[in-house]
Amino acid sequence: TLMIISKELKKVPGVKEALVGMGTDLNLDIAKVTGLSSPELEAITPNDFFVALDCENEEVEAAALKALEEQLNKKEESRSAAYYPPTLTSALKADPKINLALISVPGRHAYDVAKDALDKNINVMLFSDNVSMEEEKKLKEYAVSKELLMMGPDCGTAVVNGLPLAFANVIHKGPIGICGASGTGTQELTILIDQLGSGITQALGTGGRDLKAEIGGLMFKQCLNALIADPDTKVIIMLSKPPADHVAKEILAIAKECNDHIKPVVVDFIGGDPNLPKEYGLTAAYNLEDAARKAVALSKGEPVPADMLDIDMPKAELEALIERETSKMAPTQKYYRGFFSGGTLADESMKLSIGKLGHIYSNIPLKPEDKIENPLTAEIGRAHV
């Protein structure tokens, strides 16, 4: 992948920083934070490919470009060892039983490619982003009309029949199903369930915008109903950031019917009000680990554990950890920076930290007034990135 190529270029002696990718807003933000931005780079579109380098001199730059060429050729050589169908049509000719397509193409092509798959009665996991809200709604309405899954756009994690897709991990099969509108949250949740000795049937992603008012939870409801109908799924976890009000009522009503008559449902609206699911008689979770513990207990027919509201560690062990870590710091250090590989993990950590520390500044803050553009260089206090 392009991330791996960026990592390899950084290993070239004399390369201070390297970034290879498409011109998405996220990648351009990374370029700004890492000091690689330029007027030329800021002018590109999400469909443009770019290479940004910070090298000590021209000789290092030449070596880095040579390494880039080698990495790109290496990728092509590895592909030549196996057959990779160039189109969906040719893939279906090679294997007519295909019923799921994982799509990762530039955003301007994503709608057409996903629509083509749905036309052919193939479920879709759309990894691509930069798809308009209007196109997303059209795709999902079409998928629902054909009783197909349209996971995404910007769906980064799913596990289907034990097969991890995109950023998912290999985990054990088990009795728990996940309906998730958060990729990193779903990924972390599956790992926690696995570590607790259980496993999952399916982890179905929807894309982060599905529960917004404009989309109306079209795919969340589709995935939820699929898990309700699945006889191997004994417990369901609903995971998302707080949905739009009317969408929350609709999906919670479906969950209540399931919880009352079919199978238990655990709800984790990250950063939301845990009392809302309780009003529907559902099991509310306060964080990802709390959701995992409660789902595993319910799957075993055990009592639901007490709410996990704080760090679950013996006091003496926690104090020893604090002493060990603070001993590594200089006396002048007083603010910390939290670095997270996913927005959900940052949100959850901020929610837990704000209650004890007050303001947490971030590039994705829980409160608008705590917004900072460049948390790597800001000197205004505690920050999560």
PLM regions: where:
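Catalytic-core regions of core metabolic enzymes
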Residues: 1-382
